[in-house]
Amino acid sequence: MVRMRCREEQAPTGKSMGECIISLRGWHPALAQAELSALFPTGRVEQLSSPRLARITCKGDEQEFTIAAGIEATFQHGVNTPWIDEASLLNEIKNHLQMYSHGNASCAVHAWKHGEGISDCSRTTLAGNIGGVLSRMNAVIDLEQPERIFGVLLDGHSQTVTYGWLMDGGPKGDSSTGRRASQRPFFKPVSLEPRLARLAVNLACGPLAEGTCLDPMTGTGGFTIEAVLSERTAVGIDLDLEMIEGARRNLEWAGSNVDPFVQGDATDVRASLPEGFPVPFSGTVLDPPYGRNSHGSMDHSILLQKTLLSAADVTQGGLVLILPSEPRPDCIERALSRDERPPLKHYSWQELEGILESTSWTYQKAWYIAVHGSLGRVLIFATNALQD
């Protein structure tokens, strides 16, 4: 990472709509693209020449940028251009800085890469030369605490360069690494990693203003914890009191003092909710607890059908359903076509789609998530008739 700082005249700070370019995390770009479209349904999200880059129309101050699991960085008024040579790029950046100056805030240059980057371009040299451009524009170089960062991203997949002022101080680290499921006081080996749980909530529920997240089989509380930490309202339900008490401890450990957990039955959500609780929910997230089925000997298919029917009764929005599958090669740059989907552990795909249809959910897309050599997961997105 190379950083330099400067000072320039103040730029306008209005909240008019403009274009941003989003840099996405590499662990699953296709899911990150889907999450982005869900969080910004009116943003005209467009994938660029790399699966880790997208263009979006936005104001630039939406809270959704700060809660997305898949966003690495946001370039305000960003530009994505094919790599030609450094001289051409520096000329482009000079013109861009004349149009979008930073103002009196201190600033830095941060250059990084996706994949192998661009072989004949040194990030260190490029960042230094951009600092030179800023100096010739009467910028004061300051290598300490930037108030704004000018970003330059070299993408190896597309051989393009993305540049612009970065929102919220530049590329952000993956905050979920500090709250791994295995670090919680109440842990089960089946717990989802927080970044996947966060993405699932965002995909199912959409923008923050849409409403409350339903987690009808909360288990150790992963989905509900991520919803609450995103400042969503949420309800986590489980039939097992041990799970409810453990999920409460986990949420308190994560830094929240709210209590969104309810002991109840996933197959009868409406009856499990506190009296007068407002419905519909904006989305449902479901990772059925196979292997520790709190509903005893109930058949997998019957349990899933009853739960999905109960959720559809109180949800107007999306469903994210995560199911175990046979392993298959990684597929992180696109959703699975129907003939690419791996066999599920407990259902045939025909049976699953029949269950969805019979419970008023419409299958939309599925993505594969690798777990280990003998197990995978499939994340399925569906919508209900009310949303359709």
Question: Where are the model-predicted features located?
Answer:
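Intrinsically disordered, low-complexity boundary segments flanking structured domains
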Residues: 92-99, 139, 350-354
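Basic, glycine-rich polyanion-binding accessory segments appended to enzymes
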Residues: 109-113
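Class I S-adenosyl-L-methionine-dependent methyltransferase catalytic core
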Residues: 5-71, 114-121, 125-126, 136, ...
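Short acidic low-complexity segments
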Residues: 140-146
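Phosphate-coordination loops involved in phosphoryl transfer and adenosine-cofactor binding
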Residues: 103-106, 210
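Conserved AdoMet
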Residues: 55-101
